[in-house]
Amino acid sequence: MEIRERLEKERLFFDGGMGTMLQSAGLMPGELPELWNLSHADVIQGVHEAYIRAGAQIIKTNTFGCNGLKFGKAHGTPAVSTLVTAAVKLAQKAFQACGEKGCVALDLGPTGKLLQPYGDLPFEEAVSLYAEAVEAGKKAGADLVLIETMSDTYEAKEAILAVKEHSNLPFVVTFTFDEEGKLLSGADVETAMIVASSLGASAVGFNCGLGPKEIS
């Protein structure tokens, strides 16, 4: 059964956070965690393996902030494609090391810049930023894409378009809401869910916004 069908029919367990695990392992404030895919590959794979042993069936790549606004020759850092490829391979190796079968999700977070007209990032450029990571992830063998921590349905659309135009991978979208159940852009939960679902998301959810008290 393909992952697209499994997402629709089964209850699957993702892993947990990567950033907090890397901070515990020595990641310094302001240090780009995606660089650890090359400099601390053993640590990244170790985090993946810990989550797999805990029961995770889907592992996110260490690529949350991996885009051309931070990485590439212009920034004096490795190319996005290099970091994404390394990240996917580390997740795959983790499953192999644990003797388990599972799925690797290419993790895409926000670009970190506001979109026009509220900011200076054009829509087309944002799609292109996501597309670079999507193409590399697909080529490296990712099974699906996780578009996460979206606070704006407009930015979620950009990431979704990149996935649909540059791959045939299924995708999951998660949003982050404030205490009033609103995105930073002002959209409510229902609107966000409708937008993502109508664009073909295999699953829609939320993360990083509300704590247990607010959720209850």
Regions found by a protein language model. Give the residues of each.
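Domain-level signal for soluble alpha/beta catalytic cores
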Residues: M1-S216
